Amino acid sequence: MRYILLEYDHPQEDEAKQVYSELDRENRETRRVELYPNGLWFAYGDEHGREEALSADPFPEDVRTLNVPGEVSARTIAPGVFREVWDQAAERPDGFLSMFF
């Protein structure tokens, strides 16, 4: 497994600011957590379900090729960083429900 973080410099309110992804041996997404500027979190894959929201296309071997100066930066992160974010996402309501908590 590999873990990556995409950070968007100027997201709109309905676009994720940070996207944490877990990739399998074929560089396909198996789990993802999206953090939005307004504080919402969305998690996909594993116990959160919604696998159809995961990227069907494999990520490039060198994720730095996804970097676009002034728009998005991509980098590999440690497995523990992803697990911490994943666990936090599991403890939070996501989407519409977070308005009530």
PLM segments and residue spans:
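Short, extreme N-terminal segment that most often corresponds to the first beta-strand
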Residues: M1-A16
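N-terminal phosphate-binding or glycine-rich loops at protein starts, especially the Walker A/P-loop
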Residues: L6, S21-D24
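Generic structural motif
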Residues: Y8-P11, E26, N38, G80
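Alpha-helical interaction segments
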Residues: H10, R31, G49, E71-I77
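Short, surface-exposed coil-to-beta transition loops
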Residues: D14-V19, R28-T30
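Acidic, aromatic-enriched beta-alpha/helix-loop junctions
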Residues: D24-V68
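Short, compact, well-ordered microdomains
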Residues: P60-F101
